[in-house]
């Protein structure tokens, strides 16, 4: 029997996964949109009216405040989700004459080592993408699903049918944020109905109860999944990282973090007249061109100093161990010499004894 080609099987499965991810993107988008719409319709037609009270002016005022918040959150979800889907993540500017000249020179080179060199373009270190056969700026990575290099690529998301990158990352993160707050709002209104017995009155049908149960379960799953995923991305934004950069070993991880967490959030969400300006569901163009990113030199120097200190400590330990080994070797040599001398003495004494005996 022939041996199984494990690498070939893994590669084939990976290729099939990429095809599914590439061509089934609309299916994931349609499923997510349908689930969000189902929860929204159930909330506004069943859950929200059941929890409203018009007995006095205070409850009437509370009703309009509650309705305004609900409508605003719903608008924030759909706006950011649509913008995350239709906004391109950003690709390297291949129309530049300078970059085209560099690409042609590299492609014409017969030496493969030239393609591994770092390119300096406008005082920025660019690398070379072997799959695209073109130059790419820092933090730009090649997406195997889209088959393109993406500026400041974070990851390929099937739920938006494309990559999350420089130009649509803000919309993606705000979509997660608005969605998580919204499902919290839905659960806060639906749980009293489920456990308070209101749904079992004659006022509601079996379909109403089923819709509320499905919406509550979907909201709870979204609460856990989106909460953990959104919290991870909040950490990435606050530390100036992307999902890909977070996978690097700490010592090899480039540090693009700014002076404070606030600055890191503002560079992604935007800065306005108010503290909440970056959270508003509005059109926004990120700061910069997606190619030029400044490293935090102070932290890089600290990391290098720490590495140098560790290397120095390791060298001192090695030197100490070598000295101990040398001392041990010298001691062993001295012992061997003493043993040889003793052997000679013993043999000499034995000869002398034999002579006297004769």
From Swiss-Prot:
Entry GO CC: endoplasmic reticulum; Golgi apparatus; membrane
Catalytic activity reported: L-cysteinyl-[protein] + hexadecanoyl-CoA = S-hexadecanoyl-L-cysteinyl-[protein] + CoA
EC main group: transferase
One BP annotation, GO: protein targeting to membrane
EC number: 2.3.1.225
Residues making up the signal peptide according to the UniProt record: none
Region feature Disordered, mapped onto this chain: 302-358
Coiled coil: none
One Gene Ontology term of the molecular function aspect: protein-cysteine S-palmitoyltransferase activity
Membrane topology: Multi-pass membrane protein
Keyword vocabulary terms for this entry: Acyltransferase, Glycoprotein, Lipoprotein, Membrane, Palmitate, Transferase, Transmembrane, Transmembrane helix
Chain intervals with Low complexity compositional bias: 305-332
Cellular compartment(s): Membrane
Domain DHHC: 127-177
Superkingdom assignment: Eukaryota
Chief site of localization: membrane
Sites carrying sugar chains: 255, 296
Statement: the UniProt record of this protein carries the keyword Glycoprotein: yes
Transmembrane regions: 28-48, 57-77, 171-191, 210-230
Family assignment from sequence similarity: Belongs to the DHHC palmitoyltransferase family.
PANTHER family assigned to the protein according to its UniProt record, in alphabetical order: PALMITOYLTRANSFERASE ZDHHC16 (PTHR12246)
UniProt free text on domains: The DHHC domain is required for palmitoyltransferase activity.
Protein name stated in the entry: Putative ZDHHC-type palmitoyltransferase 4
